[in-house]
Regions:
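Residue-level recognition of strand-loop junctions within catalytic nucleotide-signaling folds
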Residues: 41, 70, 116-117, 152-154
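Alpha-helical structural signal in soluble globular domains
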Residues: 7-14, 88-96, 127, 131, ...
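Active-site pre-lysine segment of PLP-dependent enzymes
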Residues: 1-27
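Conserved PLP-binding catalytic core of the aspartate aminotransferase-like
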Residues: 82-83, 87, 96-131, 147, ...
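PLP-dependent enzyme catalytic core of the Aspartate aminotransferase-like
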Residues: 127-131, 136, 140-172
Length: 172
């Protein structure tokens, strides 16, 4: 969200062992470039530079990132889209609370949906994949009952909500 300060930059400035990373994926529309940036104490950056591979980011990716930084209109459009569809999806998932779903408040381009009912996150993930929706099941992050659902296009966001509703209703 615009104006949302998570305090990460201040933490990196005040602590020598903190690395803040950001991506150009969603807000700048450069997911395919796999490019981002980091901010940290000079000692951390120096250590990273000593071990990184040469040419670890393509020239095209670098040029795209620089151009993206100049595109305030695209960023504003992305923020507005994410805010609108994040709110819509939050309400849709909240409406499935009787099926044991709980949505964690988000200021990002995704929702964390916790499965606390009959259908597990693992089962929902598999069923959504069968319906053509790739979400992220989170056991490796200690959230065996969580799915990360990214805000997509209007069609994708409505589709994943409908698919999840069908899965939960079929389970009873």
């Amino acid at each position: 969200d615009e104006g949302q300060d998570d305090g990460a930059m201040e933490l990196a400035e005040s602590q020598a062992n903190v690395l803040v990373t950001r991506t150009f994926s969603k807000i700048h529309g450069l997911a395919a470039e796999r490019i981002g940036w980091g901010y940290a104490h000079a000692d951390i950056i120096g250590a990273m530079n000593r071990i990184r591979l040469p040419f670890n980011v393509t020239t095209a990716g670098q040029q795209a990132a620089v151009a993206a930084l100049a595109s305030n209109d695209f960023v504003a459009m992305s923020r507005a889209h994410n805010a609108k569809w994040r709110q819509w999806l939050t309400e849709e998932m909240g409406g499935l609370g009787n099926h044991g779903l709980r949505v964690v408040r988000s200021h990002t381009n995704f929702l964390l949906v916790l499965f606390e009912g009959k259908v597990t996150a693992e089962q929902a993930n598999a069923a959504l994949l069968d319906k053509g929706y790739a979400v992220r099941w989170l056991p490796g992050q200690g959230l065996v009952n969580g799915l990360r659902i990214t805000i997509g296009t209007e069609e994708e966001t409505r589709g994943v909500a409908t698919a999840l509703r069908e899965i939960l209703e079929a389970a009873g």
